[in-house]
Structure formats: C-alpha cells, structure tokens
Regions:
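Bacterial N-terminal signal peptides that target proteins for export
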Residues: 1-11
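Bacterial N-terminal signal peptides
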Residues: 9-19
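Sec/Tat signal peptide C-region and signal peptidase I cleavage site
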Residues: 22-28
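Exported/periplasmic cell-wall-interacting domains
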Residues: 27, 38, 102-104, 149-154, ...
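Intrinsically disordered, low-complexity Ser/Thr-rich linker and spacer segments
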Residues: 29-30, 36-37, 81, 87-108, ...
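Short acidic, glycine/serine/threonine-rich helix-capping segments at coil-helix boundaries
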Residues: 31-41, 46-68, 72-92
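Sec-exported extracytoplasmic/periplasmic mature domains
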Residues: 46-54, 71-79, 94-98, 123-126, ...
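A structural motif detector for short, solvent-exposed N-terminal "entry" segments of globular domains
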Residues: 94-139
C-alpha cells in the first residue's frame, strides 16, 4: 500500500508539473507574440522621441511620422527597415542609447551617408534631431539639357545661402533649401527613399524641412561623411 500511494503521489506531481509548464509556455507565447498594446506603442514613441527621432504626437497611434521615425532608428541601429513596431523592435528601442555625433562640443549638422541619416546638434554638440535622408545615388544622370554624376560630396561645409518655401531648379523642386556646396542643399522633398536616390542634394522629409531650415542659419557647419571620409571641423570653431 505504501508503494502504491507513493506511485500515485508521484503521478499526480508529474501531471501538475506538466500542466504548470504548459500554462507557463502558453502565457509566455501570448505575452511575447501578441500584438502590442497601445500603452506599449506609446512607450516606443516616447523613447524614440526622447532620443531625437521625430515621431510626431506621442499618442500610441502609429501614423506616417511614427513609421518614419522607426525607419530612421532602424537605419541608425543597422536593423531591417520595416517601419513596423513589433515586440522585438520595442525591446531594441528600450535597450538603445541616443545617437552620438562624430564631432562634439559645438552646433552642427552631420550627414551619415552609410546610414542615410542626418543628425542635428545643439550648441553643446548634443543630438537633438535625427532624420532620414536620401543623398546622391552615385549614378550618371541626363535630364533635359543637364547631365552629370549624382554625387553628394564628402567633407566639411558651411550653410552659405537659404530660401523659404519652394525653389525650382533645373533638376527639380526644393523645399526650404539650405545650400552647403555648389548649389547642393539640404531640402525637403516629397520622396525620401531609404537608399541614395538624389542628384546630390540631401533630401529630408517635407514635414521637417521648414523647422530644420529655421535651425540652420547661414554659417552652420555641415559634416558629410561615409566610413572612410570623416573630417572634423572643430578647428573652425576654436
């Protein structure tokens, strides 16, 4: 009888462990694989916004501004460009640190050609705004009476001229252009592909163009670089 009771107790314990394990696995699957709650979406927006990504309203509603901010985050972090906030993306956002510029200590703009991302800093060199860009495609073009290489120059520049609103150029329309080199500008454009597609200008989203223009007075330093071409401009501000 004692042996029978022990066997029965062991069987009941085994069943209880199996049920507990199954319930735990189901709960984990539900919490990890289910859709994000609005509070979690709002958390993702809030964290992105605090790091400098332009999310628009932080309200837990995934609109075009939120998607654009997420793509910019994914560009910077080297993640797959989906524009979707999944649970994996939320965890990546939670563990991310704010982007840091290559140069620090003074106000300037940096355009990272490899990431296709623009960083705008404050007077102390801390990043305040992060935007997606599309720069020169690197291909030869021929449009109307013009032809050339669609190239965004690397190096250090200064904003030397600005226009408000739209400006019609031989190669297209520029919205709130801030010129930095030989007619090339940082400007708004309705089309900002994930990859380099411009004739050489630095395209930014239309929604940010006016604000960015107002924050780039003539004389603002612009650093444009890829992995092999960074040049500091600290000596210009010493």
């Amino acid at each position: 009888m004692n042996i029978a009771k022990k066997l029965a107790a062991l069987l009941l314990l085994t069943i209880a462990l199996v049920v507990t394990s199954t319930s735990s696995a189901a709960g984990t699957k539900k919490s990890n694989g289910g859709p994000l709650r609005r509070a979690e979406l709002k958390e993702a927006e809030s964290r992105l916004s605090k790091m400098g990504y332009r999310t628009g309203r932080v309200d837990g509603v995934i609109d075009s501004a939120t998607q654009q901010a997420l793509v910019t985050f994914q560009k910077w972090e080297g993640r797959r460009l989906t524009g979707r906030i999944t649970r994996a993306e939320l965890e990546a956002i939670r563990s991310a640190t704010p982007p840091r510029p290559k140069d620090a200590g003074y106000k300037h703009v940096e355009v990272d050609l490899d990431r296709q991302v623009l960083l705008l800093t404050d007077d102390d060199g801390e990043v305040t705004t992060i935007l997606p860009v599309s720069t020169g495609s690197g291909k030869h073009y021929k449009e109307k009476s013009m032809s050339g290489l669609a190239y965004t120059p690397r190096g250090r520049f200064r904003i030397y001229g600005k226009l408000e609103g739209w400006r019609k150029s031989p190669l297209g329309l520029l919205y709130y252009p801030s010129y930095f080199s030989d007619g090339l500008a940082i400007h708004g454009n309705p089309s900002v592909p994930h990859a380099p597609r411009s004739h050489g200008c630095v395209r930014i989203p239309m929604s940010a163009a006016k604000e960015i223009s107002e924050r780039l007075p003539v004389g603002t330093i612009v650093l444009i670089y890829d992995a092999q071409s960074f040049v500091s401009a600290k000596e210009w501000v010493q």
